[in-house]
Amino acid sequence: MNRQSWLLNLSLLKTHPAFRAVFLARFISIVSLGLLGVAVPVQIQMMTHSTWQVGLSVTLTGSAMFVGLMVGGVLADRYERKKVILLARGTCGIGFIGLCLNALLPEPSLLAIYLLGLWDGFFASLGVTALLAATPALVGRENLMQAGAITMLTVRLGSVISPMLGGVLLATGGVAWNYGLAAAGTFITLLPLLSLPALPPPPQPREHPLKSLLAAFRFLLSSPLIGGIALLGGLLTMASAVRVLYPALAINWHMSAAQIGLLYAAIPLGAAVGALTSGQLAHSVRPGLLMLVSTVGSFLAIGVFGLMPVWLLGVICLALFGWLSAISSLLQYTLLQTQTPEAMLGRINGLWTAQNVTGDAIGAALLGGLGAMMTPVASASVSGFGLVIVGLLLMLLLGELRRFRQPPPVPDGAPL
């Protein structure tokens, strides 16, 4: 492939065996978690007939993930990262086995589902931060943009396949099959991960875990560059919460059940296109400015989305949001990994991922509140245009990020 192509270069999977192992493990893991994501709400709904109970399980799991990201960040900067990844994956699989055994009981325990949800949410996120912190060592910092784009494609592809597979399993075998295959898939991921090289953390003084986490917070707040990236990431995740308005907007547009699915598919499709056409992003001399512009553009797409007279134009706006948000996210990921000191990669990655989780929850709550006071169309537009104003202000305030320059990559003669 031509080095100047806009298309994503997949050669990293050929030239870096360790990254190929991570790619395979991540894809299997995403499919496994997707099976779980379909089964848990369906089982709780069947047991309780309460959407509140379903929502409670999501909240508990999300809370455990937040804590896991914080703890995982500290562990990834303190202990051998490969061991943290393997421990987290294996422990997570044990929780899936517990869900499977519980589902096979004549009267499954609702409390067990909640407790195992806490268990799996914590340990799943524990491994995420260690894997993120280890990525620069696996591919080299010069290949982080390419690695991030390939990872994004993996996530999108797995997110499309797993719900469909999970639905088929539910219809044919029940939730126990979903849990059992999720457990099997999780343990299978250990095989490629065992081939990873040792990933020791950089040497640093021993300190209390809370003090270590506080040091990362201070670094995040004191660094205009890293702090600005994290802030943009949170706002972008808030904007993606517009999906809570899809059912109401579908009624306004008189959409059929099949057409509603296009709304949910539009953003992932746009993001996949963004990842596929990211071949030149690594050559950007001013990635900070490009990140700011793409983020504001994505907010504008959400603002215009709700104003569209027909649903097809709305789908196009969502796809545009997905494309622009993918560009911004890839730049965020790359700058965060390259500009963060090696000794803090675990904690900063944990904080960055945690604020994404928090941003989604805050965005959903705000849109839900707006929906109670105004029409769905107005809610989507107000949120989008409000974020545009915030984004424009940040373009003025985040001067260091806006002016940040990096030299273009030097060709290394690697096969393309």
UniProtKB/Swiss-Prot annotation:
Family designation: Belongs to the major facilitator superfamily. EntS (TC 2.A.1.38) family.
InterPro entries noted in UniProt: Enterobactin_exp_EntS, MFS_dom, MFS_trans_sf, TM_effector
GO cellular component: plasma membrane
Main location, first listed in the record: membrane
Topology Cytoplasmic: residue spans: 1-21, 77-83, 131-156, 200-218, 278-287, 337-356, 400-416
Membrane-related topology note: Multi-pass membrane protein
Entry keyword annotation includes Phosphoprotein: no
Membrane side Periplasmic: residue ranges: 43-55, 105-109, 178, 240-256, 308-313, 378
Listed name of the protein: Enterobactin exporter EntS
Pfam families from the UniProt entry: MFS_3 (PF05977)
GO MF assignments: enterobactin transmembrane transporter activity
Entry keyword set: Cell inner membrane, Cell membrane, Membrane, Transmembrane, Transmembrane helix, Transport
Organism listed in the record: Citrobacter koseri (strain ATCC BAA-895 / CDC 4225-83 / SGSC4696)
Source organism phylogeny: Bacteria, Pseudomonadati, Pseudomonadota, Gammaproteobacteria, Enterobacterales
SS bond partners: none
Function, as annotated: Component of an export pathway for enterobactin.
Compartmental location: Cell inner membrane
Annotated transmembrane regions: 22-42, 56-76, 84-104, 110-130, 157-177, 179-199, 219-239, 257-277, 288-307, 314-336, 357-377, 379-399
Domain of life: Bacteria
